[in-house]
Amino acid sequence: HSQCDLHATTNIVATELAQKCSVPPAFNEAGELTNAADIQCCTSDISLAEYRTLQGKMEGADTEATSIEGYLAATPGWRTDLYNSRSTLMTHAESIELFKALGVKMTPELKAPSVEMPFNGMSQADYAQKMIDEYKAADVPASDVYVQSFNLEDVRYWIDNPPEFGHQAVYLDDRYSLDDFDHSDPATWSPTMEELVEMDVPILAPPMWMLLAANPDAADGESRIVPSVYAERAKAAGLDLIAWTFERSGPLANDGEWYHRSTDDVIDNDGDKLLTLDVLARDVGIIGLFSDWPATVTFYDNCMNAKG
């Protein structure tokens, strides 16, 4: 999921490669793990050959664990490890071949480097280009690829340089983390929706809560969830929208789920997932939705778009 998350996405901490980690596991004289909250293992810590010896797992780490076993056993109870059989890790190029064989489209994210760039002579632009080059080498049509990045400069690079891949490049919007940004106040948006369009950015992708607003006074026949000002302004400017991440949250009977933060006051059960999805699809008009699990979104699409 990022350059430095191998400790949470693989079994590296249970192997001899753990000692090569940027922050390896540490133990006291009794053999107890003492730094679970600080362990960090990066792809740049090991060679490709060493990387291939690891096994993948669902992302998660118990940062209060006192043993490696406990550290790895971090899947929330409302998720499942049923399909988590310690999968084979792949390079990006290998994943492209798998996706080609499966006949699916591809939406790679250029992850933010965890090292200072340039790194070993590779600039940020080189990094952005290398990802494109691997699709070209595999003869993947640009129309099958939605390249994405939280770094607007990456998106602008793809628009300007290999433009065929820039035609459906995705700007992942994480400006919610900025102190002076309010998704409900257009005066705080920089760049504005119109400025993004002027840059030829085709697709904007925020977390789904930024596209939604609560409507607590909804009358009979009206929805408790409605499109946000952010969503309305983006659509009015001509931007396509993709949202993330459906079913990442826990049960909606629990208050305070991050991906539903803008509608938390008007939802209270898991059925409201379908209401959220319906508003995103029909009222906001998203063109895509990231989900940790495909079943619910597929069920909705099959139901709403059934062809007789």
Locate predicted features:
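Phosphate-group recognition and catalysis centered on beta-loop-alpha active-site segments
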Residues: 1-308
